[in-house]
């Protein structure tokens, strides 16, 4: 038996809420770590910081290559990447900057 569209919409809304909560937790975690490491005190452009986080992510994933801080065509921001989570957490938190 197929689900009615209203039930599917409810399930999608519930899953979107769960995703948002998970992204918020990830952003807060990475933001706390970044602040403990002193990144809140460094005056750096967001694109440079993004590139640095992408390099760190590649290092931990075992990948190679340099990061540019720019997304390639077709790439999307899913919230599962540390750099994406930090960017959203930094915008929301803001308490670590002087």
From Swiss-Prot:
Keywords recorded for this protein, A-Z: Conjugation, Plasmid
Origin: domain of life: Bacteria
Claim: Transferase is one of the keywords in the record: no
InterPro entries membership: Conjugal_Transfer_TraC, TraC
Pfam families reported for this sequence: TraC
Disordered: annotated span: 60-98
Protein name (record): Conjugal transfer protein TraC
Lineage of source species: Bacteria, Pseudomonadati, Pseudomonadota, Alphaproteobacteria, Hyphomicrobiales
Gene of this entry: traC
């Amino acid at each position: 038996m197929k689900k009615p569209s209203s039930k599917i919409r409810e399930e999608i809304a519930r899953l979107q809420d769960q995703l948002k909560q998970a992204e918020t937790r990830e952003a807060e975690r990475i933001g706390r770590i970044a602040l403990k490491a002193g990144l809140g005190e460094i005056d750096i452009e967001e694109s440079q910081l993004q590139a640095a986080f992408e390099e760190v992510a590649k290092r931990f994933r075992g990948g190679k290559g340099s990061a540019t801080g720019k997304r390639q065509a077709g790439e999307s921001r899913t919230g599962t990447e540390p750099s994406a989570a930090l960017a959203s957490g930094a915008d929301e938190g803001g308490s670590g900057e002087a």
